[in-house]
């Protein structure tokens, strides 16, 4: 066995010494199988009930799920689709992350066509847009001549990819074909609208009003700044349900930690929150501290979990003691500092936040604005939003304004 083989075996053994097959934390729920997602998905009962109540109605609905980046919108959406796949086999559910530079009609057309691999017309639509298909798509032509007998020659050639010229019409045709096979309806879930420019999102939504009110159910996810500021005020009738996801409370976060660990535990699964074994390799005290620091933000929770378990494995320990937890926090803090160092303006604002404790339009001074090289507070809001998206700050609503406070990891340093 080579040295590299030895190191691989040692790495695997270090995780197993923690009682786990693998590190279960992941920032990308789309990589998870439905069975795994069902095991780790925690909380959101009220929100799930609101969504599933709509599915007891024959009328097609349009649902908007919105919230800050990293709040768990994708996991929530995928859990709904997983349940519907099991409970509504006669409903076709599709999922797609919004590609850049595509309108919603074309995006929905791609999602639906991919979900119908046996439909030749659907696959032809994909092929014409240059999207690979399972079946080889050819255009067949014929040449015929007549003498004493009929003579026919047939030839096939590739169809050249083209941009969808009438995606709305093509989508309607494909929906009709899909509804013949799925009488309970078609649900098209479009994720990640928050990864687009807010102005672009508003344009997309305005242009897509026709398809959103068409023959399919729609579920969309996005950021409040990109969607709700426009749609929930000027176009309130576009969605039947606008659902905001907030941070999880501490008891739910603690239960989520148990579910994550159980999904990768080698044996001795335990889901009793009062049993210390349920959070192994954490100790009850370190599990509670970990959940407190994660602030109920699912993506931040996963980032911290990855760092803490990786640190524990590298140290070769079997339990996450307060000292090991602190080492894990130090590891992710180093990564955060490196990330900030690459962003000059965000770094300067974060340093000011660390000094001030909080920052808002009402509290920032003229001297501080000059120090940052701007003339008004509105100029730094986009940077504060990006810091929020990367879990460096959090928003704290106050009476007259939104204040931003820094997210600081616990430190044992004096």
Role assignments for model-derived ranges:
Residues 1-63, 83:
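A short, basic N-terminal segment
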Residues 397-414:
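Short, cationic-aromatic polyanion-contact patches
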Residues 4-14, 168-287, 293, 412:
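The catalytic "switch" region of P-loop NTPases
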Residues 83, 307, 386-390:
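Alpha-helical DNA-recognition elements
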Residues 107-115, 285-314:
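P-loop NTPase catalytic cores that bind/hydrolyze ATP
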Residues 296, 300-374:
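Winged-helix-like regulatory helical subdomains adjacent to P-loop NTPase cores
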Residues 13, 19, 49-53, 57-187, ...:
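P-loop NTPase nucleotide-binding core
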Residues 373-390, 395:
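Short amphipathic alpha-helical interaction segments
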